[in-house]
Amino acid sequence: VDAAVSNDLFYFEHVPMRLKGIGEAAQAPAGGPPGMRGRPVPELQIIAPDGSKVAAQNGAIGRYRSTFDVQLSQKGTYKLAVANNGLFASWKENGQPRRWMGTAESFAKDVPAKAEGLKVSQTSNRMEVFVTSGAPSTDALSPTGQGLELKPVTHPNDLFAGEAAEFVFLLDGKPVADVEISVIPGGNRYRDELGEIKAKTDKDGKVSITWPEAGMYWMEAELTTDKGVSKPATERRASYSATLEVLAP
């Protein structure tokens, strides 16, 4: 499995994604926007078909990507997830913009209390990939009840070109309406147009996507709300993304 931060979909040309327990942190090249202070490294979660947790193997960090193996010892569907929860702050220091990401516990220590133009957001981000050995199963797909999540109606490893797939989006375990969904097919560097598909969840949190062709797709959902916000944050930003493979019929 490859994990990277890139500008073009499914190409490794920027920096590796840093994950706890994958490779040595000292091997990872420096990266991130100017003025961004150190951010927490997320943990990789691998859920087996029976719902148990599995450890990654042979992890390494390269110049442009992190890599690891997953032993598919069970038949069924595995869920690979990277989730991050915390705070994001921005302010000015000596006239220069500063940004910070971290935990609520470290906020008071790392961020000046009277920082100029201080803005604080409560953030939760989740990225997922689904892998199936043999017939698809559903036990590993159960939501955690935290942040913005995908609850499949159509199995994520049972997607076909020309067919509609249905998903339900949850916020803290409950269906959420009006979530903006963006779906982009891979190979965008070879197209003049992005080919983006836009959709929005209905009142029951449901959305339907029809895949125009076979291939790899990036699906992203974002939501900004003032519900469930804890101080010092004034808003909540939640995002979800998944890499999906669509097969020819």
Language-model segments: what does each one mean?
Residues 8-10, 84-94, 225-231:
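Short acidic/polar inter-strand loop motif in beta-rich domains
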Residues 42-48, 180-198:
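Short amphipathic beta-strand segments in non-cytosolic proteins
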Residues 59-75:
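A surface-exposed beta-strand-loop module
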Residues 76-87, 216-223:
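Short, aromatic- and glycine-rich surface loops/edge beta-strands on solvent-exposed regions
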Residues 101-165, 170-176, 190-191, 234-249:
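Beta-strand-rich domain onsets/edges
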